[in-house]
Amino acid sequence: MGNRAFKSHHGHFLSAEGEAVKTHHGHHDHHTHFHVENHGGKVALKTHCGKYLSIGDHKQVYLSHHLHGDHSLFHLEHHGGKVSIKGHHHHYISADHHGHVSTKEHHDHDTTFEEIII
């Protein structure tokens, strides 16, 4: 499906740095590029260093060294030209105005991203 960057409502790009999921403000680079892999109706988001964006049992966002089953699979929900990343526990990836990445149970502006094709 190709490479994407995800820019939050607040102008922060989702970013994979080391072992953490963070955000970058204002620009995107290789840390913010995710390869979207199709997995039968769901997608996996693979980082530039080969790790997978994942949501754990306690709703934390983390990077996995391998495809970690449902923890690493998402639905991309499109809303008016934007996208939300919904995980297996029906929680959305969220980036707040401070750039903190977490999950939320409900869809709102913090869970909505501009999807940029790289």
UniProtKB/Swiss-Prot annotation:
Key words, A-Z = Actin-binding, Cell membrane, Cytoplasm, Disulfide bond, Lipoprotein, Membrane, Myristate, Phosphoprotein, Repeat
According to the UniProt record, one GO cellular component term is: cytosol
Return the sequence repeat spans.
Answer: 34-46, 74-86
Provide the lipid-modification sites (N-myristoyl glycine): 2
Annotated stretches, region: Contains several HHXH repeats: 8-109
Q: How does it sit in the membrane?
A: Lipid-anchor
One of the GO BP terms on file: hyperosmotic response
**Sample GO molecular function, one term:** actin monomer binding
The principal localisation class reads: cytoplasm
Region (2 X 13 AA approximate repeats) residue ranges read 34-86
Asked whether the UniProt record includes Ribosomal protein among its keywords, one would answer no
Q: Which Pfam families match?
A: Fascin
Localization, UniProt: Cytoplasm; Cell membrane
Summarizing the function annotation, the protein's role is:
May act as an intracellular pH sensor that links chemotactic signals to responses in the microfilament system of the cells by nucleating actin polymerization or stabilizing the filaments.
Quaternary structure (record): Homodimer or heterodimer of hatA and hatB, linked by a disulfide bond.
Regarding protein family, the annotation reads: Belongs to the hisactophilin family.
According to UniProt, the name of this protein is Hisactophilin-1
